[in-house]
Amino acid sequence: MSLAIIVLLDLAYRATDLKAHYTDLGILPRSALISGVGNEWNISIHNISGLLEIQIALFAIHGLVAVALMAGYRTQVATILVWFFAISLQSRNPMILTGGDSLLGLLLFWSMFLPMGARFSVDSAMNNGPHRESNRYFSTATAAILLQVGMVYVFTAIMKSDPIWREDFSAVYYALSIDQLATGLGHYLLNYPDIL
């Protein structure tokens, strides 16, 4: 399942700065998070300890549950657990979140109400019953997840109707100038404004 692969890639990316972003030795110790930096209603299992070893263990559990979701093993339970761990991880350090993190959490939420393990999964292969579900499925969750993804494109198109995109073409330059979002390649491309 592609959603589980995205979760695994996200975990791998976050693991590169695990100590800096998720331990008490990093940029946001638990004491600072609890004292007002984060939302008081955000509860995170990652707040149980600020030790690096505990965070590594939580990342490993999150990864194992994501692998179970990818394989389609006990898909419903795996989806709920992956959503819980993803939201918990995001709540641990709200300073480093982007819109993609919110979208991932929402897609995982709606996936809890969809038959994610109905096809191409261990759950589907283990279904020994004579009754096989139809390939057609519609529910509120189906409409919601499609609407959620569709709105990303609609609002992106609306935002790109500004003259900065169509007349002077400087939007890409400005986007790559944001240090928090730009990668090494982005910083390199800033040396060639004619390409942008």
Language model feature labels by segment:
Residues 1-196:
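Alpha-helical membrane-anchoring segments
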